[in-house]
């Protein structure tokens, strides 16, 4: 079956997580992603957080499925020739270098456009234009500068970063959408364009409900936040609210049976207004249906701590899965806190391809996330990540049409690897 992005060729200069997230998603949709790596070194994540000596790390393998790898020294004159030919042969160049790196390589936007007017140049940066645009940014820096950390955690505690990679992977997903949109626009204009996604912008986009709340503060307290019910005044910035729901329906994480020994024996419980009476029945408080302090959503806001304390008395008598089964029958929104171990062993996620087992030639079988987006006419087959330079000769021949002699000349130039040394005279 033809894949959605079949025929699209991506020149991938990305490394670590943000850019590879973007290009891996495009590869899953069928694009031919050519990952350009330094000879003998490659993407730095190949050697980071290694759990097995002398093999590509999971950090690398889980971000570079379905790609081809070519090693290329872009400072080498022959390497520049190869890169020039690749630019002419590809549809999109994706990079997450520091500011100005492409220009210093001799491939400015203007130069690239002169070589291939249809090429889309997509970039991930830490910040957009402004006072911080030259600053180096990593995942947690993006979370802190994008508004996520200041609004995550408990009111009386430190700002916290989330375990989800909303800065790196989140921005990569944003960029992928920009690339696909630019490809579509190119069908109309016939031209390439620059596409940029800044990590600060991406995190702020994912934190938009907190920007919503910042504006609401000008008109009064945020009544769904627990501190309102506790009578604690609000300041001039959105506070950290623990596990309070970010929407209009109050919610909390509550203990379940076994919480004393299981760090994940918890459930998220939302007191949604349409099912309030069912909640009262489940927890054994039928009088709350008509009690003036509890019957109406507005009245309940001042008593949320008491309400959730009572609900927790009930959830502590059930495992998180027992509680979920009971609550789901009454359409009461809830969700168990699932550990990574539980997710890895969840057979339903295996069946949908959300979690996949991949076989790798040097590290063996491992688990990875699959494509989170399912398309009926473009199913995803997750293929292992490439070994360093595994497809170098294949790309030179198939993509650039090089002859055997031309391939040998590139090798001997040192552009792909150290030049072959003649045997020492005896």
Swiss-Prot record:
Q: What does this protein do?
A: Involved in the catabolism of oxalate and in the adapatation to low pH via the induction of the oxalate-dependent acid tolerance response (ATR). Catalyzes the transfer of the CoA moiety from formyl-CoA to oxalate.
State the protein's name: Formyl-CoA:oxalate CoA-transferase
User: Could you tell me what reaction this enzyme catalyses?
Assistant: formyl-CoA + oxalate = oxalyl-CoA + formate
Alphabetically ordered keywords of this record: Transferase
Q: Which residues bind substrate?
A: 247-249
Question: What molecular functions are annotated in GO for this chain?
Answer: formyl-CoA transferase activity
List the active-site residues: 168
Which residues are recorded as binding CoA?
17-18, 38, 72-75, 96-98, 104, 136-139
Looking up HAMAP family in the UniProt record yields: Formyl_CoA_transfer
UniProt family annotation: Belongs to the CoA-transferase III family. Frc subfamily.
SUPFAM superfamilies named among the record's database cross-references: CoA-transferase family III (CaiB/BaiF)
NCBIfam families for this protein: oxalate_frc, PRK05398.1
Tell me the pathway: Metabolic intermediate degradation; oxalate degradation; CO(2) and formate from oxalate: step 1/2
Single GO biological process annotation from the record: oxalate catabolic process
The EC number(s) this enzyme carries: 2.8.3.16
Q: Where is the signal peptide?
A: none
State the oligomer form and interacting partners: Homodimer.
Q: Which domain of life is it from?
A: Bacteria
């Amino acid at each position: 079956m033809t894949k959605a992005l079949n025929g699209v060729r991506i020149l991938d200069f990305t490394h670590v997580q943000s850019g590879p997230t973007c290009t891996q998603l495009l590869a899953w949709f069928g694009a031919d992603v050519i990952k350009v790596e330094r000879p003998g070194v490659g993407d730095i994540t190949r050697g980071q957080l290694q759990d097995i000596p002398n093999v590509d790390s999971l950090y690398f393998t889980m971000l570079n499925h379905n790609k081809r790898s070519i090693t290329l020294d872009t400072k080498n004159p022959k390497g520049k020739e190869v890169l020039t030919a690749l630019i002419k042969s590809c549809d999109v160049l994706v990079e997450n270098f520091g500011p100005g790196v492409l220009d210093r390589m001799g491939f400015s936007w203007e130069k690239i456009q002169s070589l291939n007017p249809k090429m889309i140049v997509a970039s991930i940066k830490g910040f957009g234009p402004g006072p911080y645009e030259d600053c180096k940014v990593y995942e947690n820096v993006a979370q802190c500068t994008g508004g996520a950390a200041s609004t995550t955690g408990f009111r009386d505690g430190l700002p916290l970063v989330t375990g989800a990679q909303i800065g790196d992977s989140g921005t990569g997903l944003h960029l992928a959408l920009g690339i696909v949109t630019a490809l579509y626009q190119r069908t109309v204009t016939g031209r390439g364009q620059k596409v940029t996604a800044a990590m600060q912008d991406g995190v702020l986009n994912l934190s938009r409900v907190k920007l919503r709340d910042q504006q609401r503060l000008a008109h009064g307290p945020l009544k769904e936040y627990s501190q309102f019910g506790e009578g604690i005044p609000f300041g001039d910035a959105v506070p950290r609210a623990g596990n309070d729901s970010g929407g209009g329906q109050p919610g909390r994480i509550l203990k379940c049976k076994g919480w004393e020994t299981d760090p994940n024996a918890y459930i998220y419980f939302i007191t949604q207004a349409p099912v309030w009476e069912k909640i009262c029945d489940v927890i054994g408080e039928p009088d709350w249906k008509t009690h003036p302090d509890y019957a109406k959503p507005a009245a309940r806001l001042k008593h949320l701590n008491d309400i959730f304390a009572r609900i927790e008395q009930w959830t502590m008598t059930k495992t998180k899965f027992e509680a979920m089964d009971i609550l789901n029958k009454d359409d009461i929104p809830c969700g168990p806190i699932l550990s990574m171990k539980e997710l890895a062993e969840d057979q339903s996620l295996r069946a949908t391809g959300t979690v996949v087992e991949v076989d790798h030639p040097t590290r063996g079988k491992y688990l990875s996330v699959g494509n989170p987006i399912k398309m009926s006419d473009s199913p995803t087959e997750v293929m292992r990540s490439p070994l360093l330079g595994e497809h170098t000769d294949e790309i030179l021949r198939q993509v650039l049409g090089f002859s055997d002699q031309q391939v040998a000349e590139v090798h001997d130039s040192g552009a792909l690897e150290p030049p072959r040394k003649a045997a020492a005279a005896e």
